[in-house]
A protein has these predicted regions:
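Juxtamembrane/disordered regions of integral membrane proteins
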Residues: 1-123
Length: 123
């Protein structure tokens, strides 16, 4: 349970940092696709985070997989999402696909790496 809590906190902090860093880029991207600004809905956002953190915990952290495997899982999840957008939305860019897929890998890998370090410190 400690692993799950630590990984969830790290995951949300890292993703929040990334979102703030790249916010303007994604605001432009979303505006090109839907013709209006981002309209974040909190409940679906929270559900998304629950699923992503569960996937990370279930497939990586609980099985003591390394950060490289976590990177591949995160990259794959985000790449599927981004290539789906790229296939469906005329104005979705390949650059967005690449940036976000790489971020998914970094997010999963770094969360795993930091969770492993912090879990050892708290035991």
């Amino acid at each position: 349970m400690l692993n799950y809590l630590i990984s969830a906190i790290i995951f949300v902090i890292l993703d929040g940092f990334y979102i703030n860093l790249i916010k303007k880029y994604f605001q432009k991207q979303i505006s090109r696709v839907q013709g209006s600004n981002i309209q974040l809905r909190m409940i679906p956002t929270a559900i998304t985070y629950v699923f992503l953190i569960f996937i990370l915990e279930y497939f990586i952290i609980s099985k003591k997989e390394n950060y490289k495997t976590a990177f591949l899982l995160g990259f794959s999840i985000y790449a599927v999402y981004e290539f789906t957008n790229y296939s469906l939305f005329k104005n979705w860019t390949l650059l967005t696909v690449i940036i976000d897929a790489l971020w998914g890998g970094i997010l999963f890998g770094l969360t795993t790496f930091l969770t492993n370090i912090l879990t050892r410190l708290f035991k």
